[in-house]
Amino acid sequence: AVNGAQNLTITGNLDLNGAITEVADFSVSGTTDLGANVTTTGTQTYSGAVTLSGAERTLQGSTITTQATLTGGSQNLIITGNAVFGNGTGDTVTGVGTLNITGNTTIHTNTITTSGTQIYGNATSDTIVIGTATTLTTTNSQITFTGLVDSESGQTNNLTLAVGNSEVEFDAAVGATTPLGAIVITGALDLDAIIQKTSGSAAGATSLTVSTTSNLGANVNTSGIQTYTGAVTLSGANRTLK
């Protein structure tokens, strides 16, 4: 095990088999094999490809940044803090069981693929920024956006969500600050917060497509088409689709 209140910088590759605890900032310039958990009081930055090995992995810190691909072996991944995934459209997250992020999330990966659930945020004030056109996929498991979902500032990025026979749940506003591009859901939709920009009540996305059922517990405002292939249920107050 490694512990201490100082920063720890590794120039090269890391094969971690013992826990790192209570380090300040932690960074690895090369590839990382995470066979143990990492806890920092500050940031964690993994510049090269990250591989998860062994059991469930927990990364705890202020902000955990992976700047390349992340590959699991069916382990669950828990990030306690903020998360930044990838820094290029070729980056991916694959092979993870469940993915749970308790803070803000920025996604710069082409895909995030898990066999189990994906949960982004722990409160409706958390933010999820879609930094590039991305596809989030599960194996018949739910994707939950607890926090606000926006595109990167100045961009209109598409968000594709594939959950099989499960559902996508939005608990906070979508596109309230920076509208998304096309939102495409293969699976069901459980909408508990508005899709609309706060300023001027403009569209919160370019379009919305849902392949199965939709529970509309909030209004939807898109600049283009809305397609609901399955049964639609209106819940709560009166609903406006525009």
Regions from the language model: what does each represent?
Residues 1-242:
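Extracellular lectin-like interaction modules
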